[in-house]
């Protein structure tokens, strides 16, 4: 009986007194607390799982939309719009990389980063063509101021010639180079290859150094002009060689040397042709000779030598 009394329910006096003082107070048991905690844990855990599932579903939908989105055709404007989607900092960084080439620094890998653009090459070529035509005309204007006997007339055709020359060089030479490297890639399995747009981008940015060089050619001193021309050519050609070397080094030494020599030679011909054509010495038809007094013929009688006839 004593054991049964011990197992019977006993009311504590303190609890009874507290309930008597605050009859409206709610009471909870330990089992209720455990139940509520489990319920909260289940709700929180289910919320996290639901959020993760929603995130995964959104990622799947995004990837599916990207896959289902049709790629624009190469003859449409949308296809080329992505190549002009660059900001000023990217263009300035690529210009800086073309002006400061050094061995082991690949312009394509360090500056293009598999994102070639046409914005920089397009405007660099346009600026170079315009500067060539303007400075070529300014050379004649300055020469006329030094020698008034020189007759100057604006040569607007130089704008067209400069534009055709620069744009053809910036597109046709990279096209030929890319085609040759692609052909050599079929014979050499380990040989890498740049894309056509990467090659065009490299050539376009390599022409930027000629813009300040052409402006400095306004100095009317021949040896200074040739010095700045050689310096600009060296920087531009070095950038091309350092960029193309990782691609051609897997080929034979003869082919690599011949290819790089051809690249430098074509670059030198461009610079030399611009120097000799747009800054050439004045032709003879631009120089008007000063009028000179022609001596009279000895058979012609001057008025003072004619004597009046007298009659006797």
Curated annotation (Swiss-Prot):
Bilayer topology = Multi-pass membrane protein
Q: Which InterPro entries match?
A: Yip1_dom, Yip5/YIPF1/YIPF2
Enumerate the GO terms in the molecular function aspect: small GTPase binding
Subcellular location, in the record's words? Golgi apparatus, cis-Golgi network membrane; Golgi apparatus, trans-Golgi network membrane; Late endosome membrane
Keywords for this protein = Acetylation, Endosome, Golgi apparatus, Membrane, Transmembrane, Transmembrane helix
Membrane: present as a keyword of the record?
Answer: yes
Q: Topological domain, Lumenal: which ranges?
A: 143-160, 217-228, 275-312
Q: Where are the transmembrane segments?
A: 122-142, 161-181, 194-216, 229-249, 254-274
Topology Cytoplasmic: residue spans: 2-121, 182-193, 250-253
Cellular component terms per the entry's GO annotation: Golgi medial cisterna; Golgi trans cisterna; late endosome membrane; trans-Golgi network; transport vesicle
Entry's Gene Ontology BP terms: vesicle-mediated transport
- Where N-acetylalanine occurs, the residues are 2
Respond yes or no to whether keyword Endoplasmic reticulum is given for this record.
no
According to the record's subunit comment, the protein's assembly and interactions are: Interacts with YIPF6; this interaction may stabilize YIPF2. May also form a ternary complex with YIPF1 and YIPF6.
Q: Which family does it belong to?
A: Belongs to the YIP1 family.
Name of the protein described by the UniProt record = Protein YIPF2
The beginning of the lineage is: Eukaryota, Metazoa, Chordata, Craniata, Vertebrata
Give the gene symbol: Yipf2
């Amino acid at each position: 009986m004593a054991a049964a009394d011990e197992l019977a329910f006993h009311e504590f006096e303190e609890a009874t007194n507290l309930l008597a003082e605050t009859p409206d107070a709610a009471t909870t048991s330990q089992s209720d607390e455990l139940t509520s905690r489990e319920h909260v844990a289940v709700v929180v855990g289910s919320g996290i799982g639901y959020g993760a599932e929603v995130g995964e579903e959104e990622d799947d939908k995004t990837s599916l939309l990207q896959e289902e989105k049709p790629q624009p055709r190469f003859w449409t404007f949308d296809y080329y719009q992505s190549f002009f989607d660059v900001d000023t900092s990217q263009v300035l960084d690529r210009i800086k990389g073309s002006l400061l080439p050094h061995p082991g620094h690949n312009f394509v890998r360090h500056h293009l980063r598999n994102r070639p653009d046409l914005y920089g090459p397009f405007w660099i070529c346009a600026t170079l063509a315009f500067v060539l035509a303007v400075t070529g005309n300014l050379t004649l204007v300055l020469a006329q101021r030094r020698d008034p006997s020189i007759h100057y007339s604006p040569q607007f055709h130089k704008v067209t010639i400069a534009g055709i020359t620069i744009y053809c060089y910036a597109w046709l030479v990279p096209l030929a180079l890319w085609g040759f490297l692609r052909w050599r890639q079929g014979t050499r399995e380990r040989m890498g290859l740049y894309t056509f747009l990467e090659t065009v981008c490299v050539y376009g940015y390599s022409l930027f150094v000629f813009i300040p060089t052409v402006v400095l050619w306004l100095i009317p001193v021949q040896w200074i002009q040739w010095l700045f021309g050689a310096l600009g050519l060296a920087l531009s050609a070095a950038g091309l060689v350092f960029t193309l070397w990782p691609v051609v080094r897997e080929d034979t030494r003869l082919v690599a040397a011949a290819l790089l020599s051809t690249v430098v030679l074509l670059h030198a011909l461009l610079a030399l042709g611009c120097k000799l054509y747009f800054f050439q010495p004045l032709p003879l038809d631009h120089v008007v000779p000063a009028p000179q007094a022609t001596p009279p013929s000895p058979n012609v009688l001057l008025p003072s030598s004619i004597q009046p006839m007298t009659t006797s």
